[in-house]
C-alpha cells in the first residue's frame, strides 16, 4: 500500500472557522481523498495542525513551525510515496511580517527536507488559500490584517 502524507495547517486539519470545531472525517478534504483512492492501494496520512507555519515560531502556540516537525513526521510515517504540502497561510499573519519571498523560502526548505528524507518522494505543492475579503475588518481573524494579503 502506498502512503500519501498530507502536511498542512488548519485547512488540512479540517477546522470549522466559525465554531473552531473540526469537520468529521467524511467532510475533510483528506477524508474525501482517502475514500476516492483507497481502493487503488493508497492510504492517506493526515498531518494537519492549526496555526502551523513553514519556518515561523508562534510566540503563544509552541510547536507550530513546520520545518522543525516535518523531518520527524516523515520518519514516523515511512515509507511515503507522495507528500501533499499545503502550508503558507499562517505565514501571512501580521506578527511575522513575512514577504512572499520569505514564505517561498520556507516552502523551499520544506521541499528540501522532503527530498533529503527520500529523493524519490513525489511532492504535490498546494498554494495557500486566498484570505478573501474582509481581512482587517471586525469579525475577521485578528491575527491577519490588510498587509497579510
Where are the model-predicted features located?
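Serine-esterase "nucleophile elbow" of acetyl-processing enzymes
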Residues: 1-49, 55-60, 72-76
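A short acidic, helix-capping loop that chelates divalent metal ions and anchors anionic groups
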Residues: 14-17, 52-57, 91-96, 134-136
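Catalytic metal-binding/acid-base residues of hydrolase active sites
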Residues: 11-12, 50, 90, 129
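Aromatic-enriched hydrophobic runs in primary sequence
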Residues: 7, 15, 37, 42-50, ...
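Alpha-helical cap/lid subdomain in secreted, periplasmic
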Residues: 31, 63-149
Amino acid at each position: 500500500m502506498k502512503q500519501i502524507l498530507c502536511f498542512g495547517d488548519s485547512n488540512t486539519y479540517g477546522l470549522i472557522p466559525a465554531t473552531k470545531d473540526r469537520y468529521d472525517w467524511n467532510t475533510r478534504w483528506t477524508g474525501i481523498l482517502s475514500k476516492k483512492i483507497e481502493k487503488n492501494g493508497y492510504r492517506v496520512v493526515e498531518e494537519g495542525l492549526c496555526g502551523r507555519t513553514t519556518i515561523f515560531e508562534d510566540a503563544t502556540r509552541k510547536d507550530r513551525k513546520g520545518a522543525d516537525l516535518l523531518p520527524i513526521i516523515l520518519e514516523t510515517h515511512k515509507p511515503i510515496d507522495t507528500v501533499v504540502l499545503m502550508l503558507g497561510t499562517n505565514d501571512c499573519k501580521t506578527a511575522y511580517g513575512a514577504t512572499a519571498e520569505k514564505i517561498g523560502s520556507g516552502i523551499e526548505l520544506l521541499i528540501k527536507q522532503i527530498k533529503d528524507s527520500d529523493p524519490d518522494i513525489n511532492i504535490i505543492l498546494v498554494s495557500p488559500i486566498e484570505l478573501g475579503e474582509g481581512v482587517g475588518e471586525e469579525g475577521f481573524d485578528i491575527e491577519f490584517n490588510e498587509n497579510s494579503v
